[in-house]
Amino acid sequence: ILDNEKKVFWQHSGLSLDLRIDRVDQLGDGSLALIDYKTGKFTNYKWFDERPDDLQLPLYQIALSTGTDQPVSATLIFQLNAENIGLISPMELSDFGAQIKVSRQAKSFEGGWPALQNYWNKSIHKLVEEFESGLVAVAPTRGATTCQYCDLGPLCRIAESEQSEIPLSEEDI
């Protein structure tokens, strides 16, 4: 264990983020592994979509990579609850052996760890640029499932966008 509760800063264009990584380990080859502890119910993390739902590990990876000379060669979730104790990773990791559960989406991702880092970096930069340009499209990536776990219901405009899809009658014109 190299660090616990590691504070990292990341900035891209006009967006600045102060982040805190639960744990950073130094591996045998000198590279870093970042670990995020989760005590809630297990979820299927969405790290590979065009607009990834789960940005915490990708953001930690880009921030830690930017703030150190040591390469980041692994990102992991340490799931710790009454139902499950174990490590989850977006990629196969030879340094950790069979004790790691690999994301189901990893099977459809072409490329190794460097390709995933590049993909995450591009995805995050694109999202930041959209945010800064004022793009505020109401477009939940998983429809009702996304909305089910969202805490921003009172502020959301999803109902407005659903109403706009209702065809107008001649009386409305």
Residues of each region from the PLM?
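RecB-family 4Fe-4S metal-dependent nuclease core
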Residues: I1-I173
